[in-house]
Amino acid sequence: MVSSTRSEHSFAGVGGVRIVYDVWTPDTDPRGVVVLAHGYAEHAGRYHHVAQRFGAAGLLVYALDHRGHGRSGGKRVHLRDLSEFVEDFRTLVGIAANDHPTLPRIVLGHSMGGGIVFAYGARYPGEYSAMVLSGPAVNAHDGVSPVLVAVAKVLGKLAPGIPVENLDADAVSRDPEVVAAYKADPMVHHGKLPAGIARALIGLGQSMPQRAAALTAPLLVVHGDKDRLIPVAGSRLLVDRVASEDVHLKVYPGLYHEVFNEPEQKLVLDDVTSWIVSHL
């Protein structure tokens, strides 16, 4: 199998914050670029196996650690506005485009990263060729009481660092080794979800139907039907609202939130890789 070589780089993000990103370069001539956004509390390194699978198909991978995450600068998991994440991601897409101007660009996001990629894609629809979302946080307010939504919005604006919600690490995967590694990873944030990020995701969910109308590029959404962190209902709603005529939702029975880290990960990665290659 073709392997990819990983290298570390950085750029100045919004407000001058140092953003660290990795590039996985396949050993053969690349035929496409995947620009990847990880989820809340984690980091790009958790996608090494994903990048290797894509590399075997001749795909370059660019993946950043969001501000306040992993190796990047900024206060831990602190966010004032979703646009900070979106514009940092856009900078990375621009770097990939400058490095490889003739290659098609696929943008991919998981969970919160899926929300970031969705928001980016809706705002800048002409900058990429296709989009892949994994368990995307595009409907985070669904099922939350109006009172809690209002509280999160106020706190998120006035005191974005205040912790408001615990996330269940056992819900990321059915694989106990994945869960154990997640819990032991020093670059994963193990505290509560802060109000700033909660506010950003709630606002994104409330504006999702309007934003979705701007998505015209091919879209693949993958989701586990036993995802307790980001229920699949949001993905179903998203694919019904996008303007694109090339939309596919793949729901995997029994899988939890991180479909790339489930025991069935080979099946999922093969499906996603095949779809990407078919859209180059």
Curated annotation (Swiss-Prot):
Q: Which domain of life is it from?
A: Bacteria
Q: What happens when the gene is disrupted?
A: Disruption of the gene affects the morphology of the colony and impairs growth in the presence of monoolein. Cells lacking this gene are more sensitive to rifampicin and more resistant to isoniazid.
Which residues are annotated as active site? S111 (nucleophile), D227 (charge relay system), H257 (charge relay system)
Q: What is its main location?
A: secreted
Q: Where in the cell is it found?
A: Secreted, Cell wall
> Which keywords appear in this protein's UniProt record, sorted alphabetically?
Cell wall, Fatty acid biosynthesis, Fatty acid metabolism, Hydrolase, Lipid biosynthesis, Lipid degradation, Lipid metabolism, Secreted
Keyword presence, Hydrolase = yes
Q: Which reaction does it catalyse?
A: Hydrolyzes glycerol monoesters of long-chain fatty acids
Mind telling me which Pfam families this protein's record contains?
Answer: Hydrolase_4
> Can you list the disulfide-bonded cysteine pairs?
none
Q: Which residues cross the membrane?
A: none
Regarding pH, the record states: Optimum pH is 8. Highly stable from pH 6.5 to 9.0, and still shows a residual activity of 50% after 1 hour of incubation at pH 4.0.
Reported function? Contributes to cell growth, probably by hydrolyzing exogenous lipids. Catalyzes the hydrolysis of monoacylglycerols (MAG) with fatty acid chains ranging from C14 to C18, with a maximum activity on monoolein. Is unable to hydrolyze long-chain diacylglycerol (DAG).
UniProt lists the family membership as follows: Belongs to the AB hydrolase superfamily.
Full protein name: Monoacylglycerol lipase
Species this protein is from: Mycolicibacterium smegmatis (strain ATCC 700084 / mc(2)155)
